[in-house]
């Protein structure tokens, strides 16, 4: 039993290290222009409103919890596409999985690992995020926040991260 516990601890530590390495600070290129944050985005605690797209985003990935003045805490929960499409937050049914272009609108093209503004979306891991945009009967689009690129060739049974959005402020 003792050896079993030690193996579980090793696996847990390995998983923690993997997650921590994907949460390292973004690498941003100062030579590429970044959009001024203040003119486009308004932060409201655990949400951020994008004036350009009229969308409000959860600042934390699904599974994480917003801590005022502390960012996002906890582990990102990975879901298959059907589960992600069925997510409903208590008290507000307006939250949904974003379309490919919507999720692509928050990619920071001057950054990678993650390719997102970490002031607005702290704790975003450099992993794939589901979109609601399908590609045939078995596939859906994802945005890979390691690079900011979108791709369509992932089976909907695969588990990826989720960031929820709603229309309006």
Predicted regions and their residues:
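Glycine-aromatic-enriched surface loops/turns that form tight recognition elements
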Residues: 2-6, 20-96, 100-169
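Bacterial N-terminal signal peptides
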Residues: 10-20
């Amino acid at each position: 039993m003792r050896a079993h516990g030690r193996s579980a601890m090793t696996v847990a530590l390995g998983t923690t290290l993997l997650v921590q390495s994907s949460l390292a600070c973004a690498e941003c290129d100062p030579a590429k222009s970044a959009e001024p944050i203040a003119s486009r985005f308004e932060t409201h605690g655990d949400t951020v409103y994008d004036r350009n797209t009229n969308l409000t985003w959860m600042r934390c990935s699904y599974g994480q919890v917003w801590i005022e003045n502390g960012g996002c805490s906890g582990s990102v929960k990975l879901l298959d596409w059907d589960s992600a499409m069925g997510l409903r937050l208590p008290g507000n049914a307006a939250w949904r999985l974003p379309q490919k272009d919507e999720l692509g609108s928050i990619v920071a093209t001057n950054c990678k690992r993650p390719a997102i503004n970490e002031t607005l979306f702290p704790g975003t891991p450099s992993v794939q995020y589901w979109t609601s945009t399908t590609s045939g009967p078995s596939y859906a689009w994802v945005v890979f926040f390691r690079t900011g690129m979108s791709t369509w060739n992932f089976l909907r049974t695969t588990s990826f991260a989720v960031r929820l959005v709603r229309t309006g402020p």
